[in-house]
């Protein structure tokens, strides 16, 4: 069996030795490990291999490190996700294809959308599609129906693949640290509809994308990964849009790989990634 062990605790001398000693006593093999110290905090991630009782192992670590330490042990497996989308197909389509090709370290349990444009696409992959419209209803009522729908699924993460709805603090609170979003990096310079057209009119020279965890502040959650590409005056706004969509797909895909491999620590409003 393979497991991922993650530890975050106040830095102290001898932590690596003490953790390794517990691992050794349980006859566990360390396949790979990483550590980092910053802001007087110690971060440790290890890929483990062995047959052992996880509950007893965790109890020993907790007794040694103290109750204030953050300790997680996950069996290495594919994660389960639900995808939220609206009308744009590029990010959703990329994830569906990767899932179909067994290149995504996750099982897509369902797709939820506030519009019906993407239903035919999702149906081709035999994945449940739920239309939960936001028309003529309050945000609270629409999110309540979304929560009811989610009760039918066991999942690890929610992925916002260009879901053009602002989630309420109450909704986010249900899934703290478990919602991943992708957006173009023009914010806050180009807010609202047609950001690529706005960027074209402004004459920007780079375009990019950011993947981040969602918190109560719009597009200000802990950043997972970012990327940019250079453009010039020869790009029409349609070409900028196409290039932007490609980079959004790539950034979201890379971010999800990091999340699904349990490589990320969220500390304050930042991420530590191994």
Feature-to-residue mapping (PLM):
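Short internal beta-strands
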Residues: 106-117
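Adenosine-nucleotide cofactor-binding segment
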Residues: 123, 127-153
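Conserved beta-strand segments of alpha/beta enzyme cores
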Residues: 29, 107, 128-130, 178
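Short, low-order "capping/linker" segments at domain edges
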Residues: 78-94, 98
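Donor/substrate-binding cores of folate-linked one-carbon enzymes
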Residues: 115, 138-144, 153-274
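A conserved regulatory-domain signal marking ACT and ACT-like small-molecule sensing domains
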Residues: 1-79
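A short alpha->loop->secondary-structure connector
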Residues: 99-107
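Short hydrophobic segments within beta-strands
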Residues: 8, 82-84, 112
